[in-house]
From Swiss-Prot:
Entries under InterPro entries matching the protein: FAD/NAD-bd_sf, MQO
Name of the featured protein: Probable malate:quinone oxidoreductase
Organism: Mycobacterium tuberculosis (strain ATCC 25618 / H37Rv)
GO MF annotation: an example: L-malate dehydrogenase (quinone) activity
Catalytic activity, as annotated: (S)-malate + a quinone = a quinol + oxaloacetate
UniProt key word Oxidoreductase: yes
Keyword Translocase: no
Family in the record: Belongs to the MQO family.
Gene: mqo
Record pathway: Carbohydrate metabolism; tricarboxylic acid cycle; oxaloacetate from (S)-malate (quinone route): step 1/1
One GO cellular component term noted in the UniProt record for this chain: cytoplasm
Pfam families documented for this protein: Mqo
Length: 493
């Protein structure tokens, strides 16, 4: 074992979260030493990879689970506004990064693609009519359209209109300012900038242990997966952005804040088509309602994607299940994560989430023709041979201790950290990558409270609206939107 080395910051995981935090810290503290540790041999090889996530740029423009109908018939847009506010923070940071040479190829990861909500049936049509009215009063969603004309539907979505009888009413909410995001390509540029500016990147290294020292620092024990060599690294601050592996790594640290937390892995599968004739006839991301019992992230959607310069159509997700916490993980991941302090949490979810379990079982039983049949509800002319099944990444949803039920399953992201701010990690999946900057700013504020005020001037250069709710400041929103649109070379698709 080699001698103990020291670094100011350790980032575990080479995905979008560590990439974002790495750039923030590099700009704030250019002289700090930063070490990135990744168990695989590449950047963004797990959840941030383009084929391992939906790439919708979760800005809450089209996801209907963010705009639920209330018992009185009104539409609650609170969650949609909150998510979009976070996305605006991320968008501004990307614009700053593009202007300052951090992101040198914006189009490789960001492309304009409308975001669309799709329903059929008179009840769904009325829901979208009320949804559009509720959103139109907010500056973040002011451009959202309501469309119910079959002719206009066919003009905008020819692939979905082909062979559609229009015997029942259909409707759309159309947000022209949506984007497709390749978070893998983005993470590569961000980490590339970090490495070019002094960050050490250790690929093929797996963290085996985290131990706190008497001076409050951490010793990180890692193993080179190629040679078996073990190394130790001492650091003042650890961030765990390891996707599904974050919970097991935090458990190794022994911090009391992680006790009671558990993880529930949900896999995803998609149908994919690269036929240029198909991609030319569908230039949008179109979301439907979540199926009964499906988790919020289970709403089916038919998306235009851009990966490595090529356009694709992707439909799904179909839920899968594996005890692995990572796509490249082990089947022992789930059982090894269950400990005395979180056993009741896991059992509680097993008893209370029967609908989810039934949904997962039904998804696992789907045949190939049944998957394409679900696609034909969106695109009646879809041909089986045009589509192939692709396996996406794992999402480990948060199970939190609950006094009443033992445990509750949460579909969101949670930052867990030690009280002294020396270690933090991100649990959960959705909305995830799209809100990375807002989440990492929260990590900075919690973990570097004594420095945060001195960092604010620089942070406000990166995110001009920092600390402001743009939905309450339409003039400022228009200003930063115009600036970021120009910097990111975006416009209506």
């Amino acid at each position: 074992m080699s001698d103990l080395a020291r670094t100011d910051v350790v980032l575990i995981g080479a995905g979008i979260m560590s990439a974002t935090l790495g750039v923030l810290l590099r700009r704030l503290e250019p002289n700090w030493s930063i070490t990135l540790i990744e168990r695989l041999d590449a950047v963004a090889a797990e959840s941030s990879g383009p084929w391992n996530n939906a790439g919708t740029g979760h800005s809450a423009l089209c996801e209907m689970n963010y705009t639920p109908e209330m018992p009185d018939g009104s539409i609650d847009i609170t969650k949609a506004v909150r998510v979009n506010e976070q996305f605006q923070v991320t968008r501004q940071f990307w614009a700053y990064a593009a202007e300052n040479g951090i992101l040198t190829d914006v189009r490789s990861f960001l492309n304009p693609v409308p975001h669309v909500s799709f329903v059929h049936g008179s009840r769904g049509v009325e829901y979208l009519r009320r949804r559009q009215k509720a959103l139109a009063g907010n500056p973040l969603f002011a451009g959202t359209e309501f469309i119910e004309s079959p002719d206009e539907f066919a003009r905008r979505l020819p692939f979905m209109a082909a062979k559609r009888a229009f015997s029942e009413p259909v409707a759309l909410n159309w947000a022209a300012d949506g984007t497709d995001v390749d978070f893998g390509a983005l993470a590569k540029q961000l980490i590339g900038y970090c490495v070019q500016n002094g960050t050490t990147a250790l690929f093929g290294h797996e963290v085996r242990n985290l131990s706190r020292q008497s001076d409050g620092s951490w010793t990180v024990t890692m193993c080179n997966r190629r040679t078996g060599e073990k190394r130790k690294l001492n650091t003042k601050f650890v961030f765990v952005g390891a996707g599904g592996d974050t919970l097991p790594v935090l458990q190794k640290s022994g911090i009391k804040e992680v006790k009671g937390f558990a993880g529930f892995p949900i896999g995803g599968r998609f149908l994919r088509a690269g036929n240029p004739a198909l991609t030319a006839s569908h230039r949008a991301k179109v979301y439907g309602f979540p199926a009964p019992g499906a988790p919020p992230l289970g709403a089916l959607h038919l998306d235009l994607r851009f990966v490595n310069g090529k356009s694709w159509l992707v439909f799904g997700p179909y839920a899968g299940w594996s005890p692995k916490f990572l796509k490249h993980g082990q089947i022992s991941d789930l059982p090894r994560s269950i400990r005395p302090d979180n056993l009741l949490s896991v059992l509680g979810v097993g008893l209370t989430e029967r609908r989810l379990l039934n949904y997962l079982i039904s998804q696992l039983r789907l045949s190939e023709p049944e998957r394409v049949s679900a696609l034909r509800e969106f695109a009646p002319s879809a041909i089986d041979s045009d589509w192939e099944l692709t396996i996406a990444g794992q999402r480990v949803q948060v199970i939190r201790r609950d006094e009443r039920n033992g445990g509750v399953l949460e579909f969101g992201t949670t930052v867990i950290g030690d009280a002294d701010g020396s270690i933090a990690g991100l649990l959960g999946g959705s909305p995830g990558a799209s809100t990375a900057v807002a989440i990492m700013l929260d990590v900075l504020q919690k973990c570097f409270a004594n420095r945060y005020q001195s960092w604010l001037p620089t942070l406000k250069e990166m995110v001009p609206s920092l600390g402001v709710q743009l939905s309450n400041e339409p003039a400022l929103f228009d200003e930063v939107w115009s600036w970021s649109t120009k910097a990111l070379k975006l416009g209506a698709a």
